[in-house]
């Protein structure tokens, strides 16, 4: 008798769930993506115990017809593709037909759904993938799917679940990414009756950024645009002063789908060039529209890995768009924000991307001229059971029955409010949508500005140049400023191979390990791009008989060794990066250092040269060359700006 048997469908679904349903966040992702594919404009996600006890997704999409409800729990049953040709032009987020049966096989699932054409809805209850009941339900256009007791029948999976806070953080991150991908949809995330995130769904991506990362972050984002025959690129990137220590704040979207792609991440960093500090990464939300035939999403069950045709062309488009956006405006960081930035960074990390413990209201401090959140404020939502009335319900009525929220005043109160404030659905929506920053006006101001006309005052600690203009006080780092000047000079020079060479009376010999000798022998032409000509000389040796005139004779051996190290350490060698690294190295080593006194004439000459640079705002390594104290900043420090705490609260436009 043969040993191979065909597994029953329930067991096959549990096996598939091992790939599709890694954790509660995977369930949230699949269900919300189904709601998006159904054309929903409002989606509510309720979770309890980080999704282990309950995940509930409610939408106002097209809904399922009665005969399709039971079929939806069958493996590879889908309405999104019909033949093999459709597999190569996928326009929906889901298409495999694996998610619902896989989720149902490891949970207790309830589906309540109805279409606009049907007179009543349908309710399905399944346990472990087996349908227990299928009955009619009061009509409400859209779908509500409840997933209870996740992994109840696969206890081994629970051993690998991290803390509830960690799992909830993953869920929050998923909703953040989907909100950024679809600003036209209103998303509401509720955990244990507390609202974590609410977006307005008005199509304004920057308002979504403000809801997720905070108003301060949204104000420091610059819009990017670009297109060619194959791609259309839109989105926002942060100013170089707004960075984080990892790539978690970079969101890349292909046709509305969040993906992970190392090469596109690298293209973003190349667009910033040397405006970023080493080891720092920007905020970026890039939305890329592409012909579906150029993207293969059928690579991994999570569909986060996508193979792209013409990937190099897309990288070039991204880098160019970011570089152009950042070249249009003044990139001088505000000094007070720079001083407070590191202290605020940990606080800002907790806004939506990491897990916020409570969603507190915004207040406006007229003295600080900034928004703040009262620590004492608490969040209250009364959750009632949905009405069982057989009459037809609208989506808004349905969600009100689920969350039972009350309207409150749209005004933002001052610090004298009571210590406990009730937050409602409407008030939180006002925070996102009614306070609208005049982002366009801000962008116009930045784009019309130029490098300031600086009047030199004095040198501070033989390191910084104090200057003033009508905009306020400026501090210039003399080393960083000269490094920027020399970097731009050497970058151009290194790109030009001059015939003018200085003959060495005593040639230099460079001895390498055998493996390094082989690599350098193959790549030595790259040194020719910088005017450095090495010849093979004996075993494992190169000889240098002449050097470019821009290279100081006292620094020849050290500089050539560093050039060799750059080539040997680069697995994927880029001539552009090589020239940058080499120019940065030469510029840094030859620039004036800290504690170097300068007379007034030299200081003014340095400032004049800095003003002529293509990018005068940062050195070759991304450190700022100049910081700014505005007149208001200085007056605030001396308490010369005083307003009562009971002044009328400002809107986002007033804040600008």
Curated annotation (Swiss-Prot):
Annotated gene: mutL
Cited SUPFAM superfamilies: ATPase domain of HSP90 chaperone/DNA topoisomerase II/histidine kinase, DNA mismatch repair protein MutL, Ribosomal protein S5 domain 2-like
A Pfam family reported for this protein in Swiss-Prot or TrEMBL: HATPase_c_3
The name this protein goes by in its record: DNA mismatch repair protein MutL
GO cellular component terms listed in the entry, alphabetical order: mismatch repair complex
UniProt function note: This protein is involved in the repair of mismatches in DNA. It is required for dam-dependent methyl-directed DNA mismatch repair. May act as a 'molecular matchmaker', a protein that promotes the formation of a stable complex between two or more DNA-binding proteins in an ATP-dependent manner without itself being part of a final effector complex.
Molecular function terms, GO-annotated: ATP binding; ATP hydrolysis activity; ATP-dependent DNA damage sensor activity; mismatched DNA binding
Family: Belongs to the DNA mismatch repair MutL/HexB family.
Keyword set, alphabetical order: DNA damage, DNA repair
């Amino acid at each position: 008798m043969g040993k191979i048997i065909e597994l029953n469908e329930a067991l096959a679904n549990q096996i598939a769930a091992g790939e599709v349903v890694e954790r509660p966040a995977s369930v949230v992702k699949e269900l919300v993506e189904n709601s998006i594919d159904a054309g929903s404009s409002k989606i509510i996600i309720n979770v309890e115990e980080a999704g282990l006890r309950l995940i509930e997704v409610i939408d106002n999409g097209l809904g399922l017809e009665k005969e399709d409800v039971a079929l939806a729990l069958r493996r590879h049953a889908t309405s999104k593709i019909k033949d093999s040709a459709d597999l190569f032009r996928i326009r929906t987020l889901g298409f495999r037909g694996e998610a619902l049966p896989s989720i149902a096989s490891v949970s207790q699932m309830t589906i309540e759904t109805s279409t606009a054409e049907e007179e009543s809805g349908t309710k399905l209850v399944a346990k472990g993938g087996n349908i227990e009941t299928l009955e009619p339900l009061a009509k409400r256009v859209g779908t509500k799917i409840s997933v209870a007791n996740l992994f109840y029948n696969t206890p081994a999976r629970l051993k690998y679940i991290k803390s509830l806070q960690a799992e909830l953080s993953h869920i929050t991150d998923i909703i953040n990414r989907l909100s950024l991908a679809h600003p036209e949809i209103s998303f509401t995330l509720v955990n244990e009756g507390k609202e974590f995130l609410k977006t307005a769904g008005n199509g304004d991506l920057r308002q979504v950024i403000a809801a997720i990362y905070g108003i301060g972050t949204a104000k420091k984002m610059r819009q990017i645009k670009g297109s060619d025959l194959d791609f259309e690129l839109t989105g926002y990137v942060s100013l170089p002063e707004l960075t984080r220590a990892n790539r978690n704040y970079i969101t890349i979207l292909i046709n509305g789908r969040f993906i992970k792609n190392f090469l596109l991440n690298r293209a973003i960093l190349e667009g910033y060039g040397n405006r970023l500090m080493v080891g720092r990464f920007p905020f970026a939300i890039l939305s890329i529209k592409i012909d579906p035939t150029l993207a293969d999403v059928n690579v991994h069950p999570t569909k986060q890995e996508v193979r792209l045709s013409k990937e190099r062309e897309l990288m070039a488009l991204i880098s160019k768009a970011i570089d152009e956006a950042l070249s249009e405006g003044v990139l001088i960081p505000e000094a007070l924000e720079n001083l407070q930035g590191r202290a605020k960074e940990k606080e800002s990390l907790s806004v939506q991307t990491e897990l916020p413990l409570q969603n507190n209201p915004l207040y406006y401090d007229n003295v600080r001229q900034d928004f703040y959140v009262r620590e004492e404020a608490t969040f209250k939502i009364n959750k009632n059971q949905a009405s069982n009335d057989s009459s037809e319900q609208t989506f808004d009525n349905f969600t009100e029955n689920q969350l039972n929220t009350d309207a409150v005043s749209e005004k933002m109160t001052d610090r004298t409010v009571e210590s406990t404030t009730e937050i409602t659905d409407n008030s939180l929506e006002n925070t996102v949508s009614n306070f609208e920053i005049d982002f366009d006006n801000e962008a116009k101001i930045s784009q019309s500005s130029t490098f300031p006309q600086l009047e030199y005052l004095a040198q501070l600690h033989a390191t910084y140049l104090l200057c003033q203009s009508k905009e306020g006080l400026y501090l210039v780092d003399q080393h960083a400023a000269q490094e920027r000047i020399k970097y731009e000079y050497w970058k151009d020079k290194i790109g030009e191979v001059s015939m003018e060479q200085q003959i060495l009376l005593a040639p230099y010999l460079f001895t390498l390990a055998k493996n390094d000798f082989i690599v350098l022998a193959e790549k030595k032409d790259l040194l020719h791009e910088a005017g450095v000509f090495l010849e093979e000389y004996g075993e494992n040796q190169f000889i240098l008989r002449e050097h470019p005139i821009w290279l100081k004779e006292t620094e020849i051996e050290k500089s050539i060794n560093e050039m060799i190290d750059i080539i040997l350490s680069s697995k994927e060698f880029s001539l552009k990066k090589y020239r940058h690294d080499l120019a940065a190295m030469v510029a840094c080593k030859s620039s004036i250092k800290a504690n170097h006194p300068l007379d007034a004439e030299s200081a003014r000459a340095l400032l004049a040269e800095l003003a002529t640079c293509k990018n005068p705002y940062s050195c070759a390594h991304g450190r700022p060359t100049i910081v700014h104290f505005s007149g208001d900043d200085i007056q605030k420090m001396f308490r010369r700006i005083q307003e009562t705490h009971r002044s009328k609260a400002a809107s986002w436009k007033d804040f600008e």
